[in-house]
Curated annotation (Swiss-Prot):
Coiled coil: none annotated. It is found in: Cytoplasm. It comes from Homo sapiens (Human). Expressed in brain. Expressed in muscle tissues (at protein level). Residues 19-39 are annotated as: Disordered. This is Putative protein ATXN8OS.
Length: 200
């Protein structure tokens, strides 16, 4: 049985499945012919394997996907060790990318994301009562990338999380933001950064 891919590794929002492949960027840069190819490589090499792994750990369960038997290839954790400049999956895109992940039963694990140990994760708590793990501070202060922005604040008295992908192009200073799902009932958020040095 093949590993469940993007159609099955979906997010739950307001009781319905939201296919991961439905992600859209609100602002698209003009004059970039390789944008589509870059996005496709990013999804195939980074997000789809990560979502499949989270699904195997029962952290994300869609109503239909939760009933599927998981093949052995979906039970493998990410490779040990942090990513370094020049890693294959870092070469697949040129812009800084930031990803936020939410889970109802998140427990910090040393192998949750590739760069966790190297970037010095710290468990903090904001004014809204959310537990937040972030690894972004050292990255954006050193590399001048996208500043850390927590999406787990209280809004109108209700807890609200957004699962998102943010991109930022250093050479033009453009920032695009894409919201994939909003789930009010989730209680914890995991924020991670995947990055490479940019050529301007």
């Amino acid at each position: 049985m093949p590993c469940p891919g993007a159609p099955c590794c979906s997010l739950v929002a307001t009781g319905s499945r939201v296919p991961f492949s439905g992600l859209k960027e609100e602002e698209e840069e003009d004059g970039e012919d390789d944008e589509e190819e870059e996005e496709e490589g990013f999804f195939q090499k980074v997000l789809t394997p990560l979502l499949s792994w989270l699904l195997s750990r029962r952290l994300w369960l869609g109503p239909q996907c939760s009933k599927l038997p998981l093949p052995s290839c979906c039970r493998q954790p990410p490779p040990a060790g942090p990513p370094v400049e020049g890693d294959g999956w870092l070469k697949s895109f040129q812009r800084s990318r930031r990803m936020c992940f939410t889970s109802k039963s998140f427990r910090p694990e040393p192998d949750m994301l590739y760069a966790q140990k190297a970037k010095g994760w710290q468990l903090t708590q904001d004014s809204g009562g959310w537990e937040v793990q972030d690894q972004c501070t050292r990255i954006w202060s050193k590399e001048n990338l996208l500043a850390l922005n927590t999406h787990s604040r209280r809004q109108k008295g209700k807890r609200e999380n957004k699962v998102c992908v943010s991109t930022w192009q250093k050479s033009r200073g453009d920032r695009t933001y894409s919201s994939m799902a909003t789930t009010p009932s989730m209680t914890k958020i995991l924020e991670g950064c995947m990055y490479r040095k940019l050529k301007c």
